[in-house]
Each structure stands twice: as structure tokens, then as C-alpha cells.
């Protein structure tokens, strides 16, 4: 991973990361990181390198990658999931879903189908959509995918900015980001969300 990061820098390309997730969308339910220490060590080093850059977007990516470490180690989401409120997923059949990370073994529901209504607002503002959002608020998965994390990082930027500033200053002063110190932000999230 770190070699790819350096290659992307040399090519002046952006570098994005992800971890295994299980869901109906991926047609996979048995993904598991088995070499947790090695993978988290690589993410740790990536975070250190991202925080050395002079680009605030890289610092935000460092925060996202800290969330990946937390996810891989089985922790709760650092920020709430607001899938179905801040974003949605449209499948090829017209189903409007809160996200593409749902598992039938956990829960699976649609907000509605575009083929059955006159316009999107009928789905987005429906009672069914409200029911699905309540399920999201109690979802046990603790996913950490860019599609659901990026919107809440932007929404709660004033909450995560102190972490970014503190750790940028640490790196400037020659220290490392402590990736064992995982921040959690309570911004109205349901206490049941992310309890695996």
C-alpha cells in the first residue's frame, strides 16, 4: 500500500484507501482482515506521511485512515452513520437504499423504488424513508466506507478539526500521530449504532 501511495504522489494523483466490507452489493459475506497488525501498521505509516503533506485534504484523509484502523480492529464508528439522510445508493433496479453496505444477516431495507413513483421526493420524504433512517440510526455494522463517512466528516468538520490541527502540530514538531488514540464524536448519534 505504501509503495502505491508513493507512486500516486510521484504521478501527482490522489490516493484513496478502503478496507474489506461485507454486503449484498459486494456479493461477499466472509471478508476478513487476517493480518490485522501488518495492515494497521501500514495505515499508521500512511497517516504519518499524509500529515506531513501541506494539503488539508491529505490531513482529512489521515483522519479517514484512522477510522479504517479503528474499523479493522472492530471499533465503533468515530462519527455517526447518516446514510439515507446525507447520501443514498441507487441500485440498477431503481431501489433507493441508504447505502451499499447492508447485509441481509444484519438488516436490509429500501426506501422505495423509482419505477413506482413520479419523482424522487416521494421516496425521500416518505414514511418508509423515515423508517429506514431509524434503522440506520441503530445499525450494528460500524462500516467505515468513504461514501458514508465523507458526508459526515464534512458535516461535522468543526468536531474533527481539533484532531487534525493537534496532529498536524505534533508532526510539525517532530512527533508522530498516536493512532492508538481513537477519538469518538457524540453529535446526536444513537448509542445503539455500531454495537456489534
Pin down the residues of each PLM region.
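Flexible mid-to-C-terminal extensions adjoining Fe-S/redox cofactors in radical SAM and related proteins
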Residues: 95-96, 100-196
